[in-house]
UniProtKB/Swiss-Prot annotation:
Keyword Membrane annotated: yes
CC annotations in GO: chloroplast stroma; chloroplast thylakoid membrane protein complex
Cofactors named for this entry: FAD
Residues of the FAD-binding FR-type domain: 83-205
Annotated localization: Plastid, Chloroplast stroma; Plastid, Chloroplast thylakoid membrane
Protein name: Ferredoxin--NADP reductase, leaf-type isozyme, chloroplastic
UniProt keywords, alphabetically: Chloroplast, Electron transport, FAD, Flavoprotein, Membrane, NADP, Oxidoreductase, Photosynthesis, Plastid, Thylakoid, Transit peptide, Transport
Pathway listed: Energy metabolism; photosynthesis
Binding, FAD: 141-144, 162-164, 168, 179-181, 220
Length: 362
């Protein structure tokens, strides 16, 4: 807590007149104020003692309200909670990966009648039907919204998700199915779904319509960026028109796993000066060294340009997807920063504080 010190100093002259001075000091450290005799020399006579009267208060200075660089005005969180979820209905559920893709991913649209006021970059929770092994309701699972606030139908009455069906073999050789992902991927139109939220402010879009927005996604981590890009390039808003640069890097294992490819290519055709698109298909592509093309491998091909952009105060990085992607991206940035005598870990902290480095991995 800051401490305010107010000191009154009286300097009596040989003619019995007095001079009074008052000052205030704000210090962020604790102040130990000791009474110390202070002398001054009066040119008309000898030295005289100055008396000091101190008043110490512990009133904190008024906090300066931080102004966010993101579109956070009026953002609502946790309108619906697990005990009282919103009950929506499935309107559409379709598989968006090829039959030969390693795993299924589904795009689904739920009716909300405008009751779940999410924003681009937020998430919603879903509670699967049924109970767990202990007879209790299943815990909610969070999913990034894959639609803009207007929804896929443009009427602000729906929300869309992008969900991969989780199926794996455990240590005992048994097939295990993720409860919520399989519940969602199996939903039929008309079925009810319990929704909580919306939640999250980390991944909200930047306010600046002239910003450079670099999006790094693996797999279903594409969801929030689809919502960004729909708002940027497929919609018209009275209070928002994107004039900056949106650059999407999407990493997947096979071409049949590329999500929303046709949509993104249409956006590129519509706004070639504002939208850049780079895919990294690890099982099918390699770089000039013959290395598999992961998302960080693709980024390395643009390392100099990315580093230059990252040093501008209107460049925003968003990362969403598998947790493993973060290390590879950090390694690229660390090498570039070191070349300029910068410690990447410290620089990244500054970017996070400035809301320019935003991560949501799982």
């Amino acid at each position: 807590m800051a401490t305010a010190v107010s000191a009154a100093v009286s300097l009596p002259s040989s003619k019995s007149t007095s001079f009074s001075s008052r000052t205030s000091i704000i210090s962020t450290d604790k102040i130990n104020f000791n009474k110390v005799p202070l002398y001054y020399r009066n040119v008309s006579g000898g030295s005289r003692l100055v008396s000091i009267r101190a008043q110490v208060t512990t009133e904190a200075p008024a906090k300066v309200e931080k102004i966010s660089k993101k579109q956070d005005e009026g953002v609502i969180v946790n309108k619906f909670r697990p005990k009282e979820p919103y009950v929506g209905r499935c309107l559409l559920n379709t598989k968006i990966t090829g039959d030969d893709a390693p795993g299924e991913t589904w795009h689904m649209v739920f009716s909300t009648e405008g009751e779940v006021p999410y924003r681009e970059g937020q998430s919603i929770g879903v509670i699967a039907d049924g109970v767990d092994a202990n007879g209790k309701p299943h815990k909610l699972r969070l999913y990034s919204t894959a639609s803009s606030a207007l929804g896929d139908f443009g009427d602000s009455k729906t929300v869309s998700l992008c969900v991969k069906r989780l199926v794996y073999t455990n240590d005992k050789g048994e097939e295990v199915k993720g409860v919520c992902s399989n519940f969602l991927c199996d939903l039929k139109p008309g079925a009810e779904v319990k929704i909580t939220g919306p939640v999250g402010k980390e991944m909200l879009m930047p306010k600046d319509p002239n910003a450079t927005v670099i999006m790094l996604a693996t797999g279903t981590g594409i969801a929030p960026f689809r919502s960004f890009l729909w708002k940027m390039f497929f919609e018209k808003h009275e209070d928002y028109k994107f004039n900056g640069t949106a650059w999407l890097f999407l990493g997947v294992p096979t071409s049949s796993s590329l999500l929303y490819k046709e949509e993104f290519e249409k956006m590129k055709e519509k706004a070639p000066e504002n939208f850049r698109l780079d895919f990294a298909v690890s099982r099918e592509q390699t770089n000039e060294k013959g290395e598999k093309m992961y998302i960080q491998t693709r980024m390395a091909q643009y390392a100099e340009e990315l580093w230059t952009l990252l040093q501008k105060d209107n460049t925003f990085i968003y990362m969403c997807g598998l947790k493993g992607m973060e290390q590879g991206i950090d390694e690229i940035m660390s090498a570039l920063a070191e070349r300029d005598g910068i410690v990447w870990a410290d620089y990244k902290k500054q970017l996070k504080k400035a809301e320019q480095w935003n991560v949501e991995v799982y």
